[in-house]
Amino acid sequence: MADEVNENIFLVNAPAGSGKTTWIRQQVESYLLRNPKDNILCITYTNRAAEELGRDLEQSRVYFGTIHSFINDFIGSFFSHKEIIDLYWEVYETQIIERIKNTEQKETWTEGAERYKEKYGSLDLDTVRSNINKISYNETPFNSLLYGGLGHNDLITFTKLAVDRFPIIKKKISDKYQ
């Protein structure tokens, strides 16, 4: 059911009803007792699993959540830094220009452009650039690039780029959860 991938890093993969929650909870409780100054990061596949694992546990030293919620809650605080926004533009500027031009005349892009113009007065690269002051998680499969919003897959991809480019993010995670 559980394989130790690295020291103190486990991959738990088993079918429903096999005792995953019980096993993880026991491991967390045991670790917290043995290591009273440490914190635990426990990434789950679903929000429901995170809620179930966290039930009846003192959670000030344990983070239960999906990878998306962890990025949003912990790493998301970095997503308003100028360097991160610059990276966003480096990665997504071409796609943003495509959305603005909408040469393929995609109906959803046309509707989105109209909403953007209503909100900000115009839709051009300078306006979009001046309005994105934080990168955020949309909690959907789709990006909202004109607003700095990333969907499920791009949130993970972009976060990896940010962590690789800015080692301080990795250090903050290590300091808290290693």
What label would you give each PLM region?
Residues 56, 70-74, 99, 103, ...:
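Residues that form generic nucleotide/phosphate-binding pockets
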Residues 82-110:
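Conserved phosphoryl-transfer catalytic core
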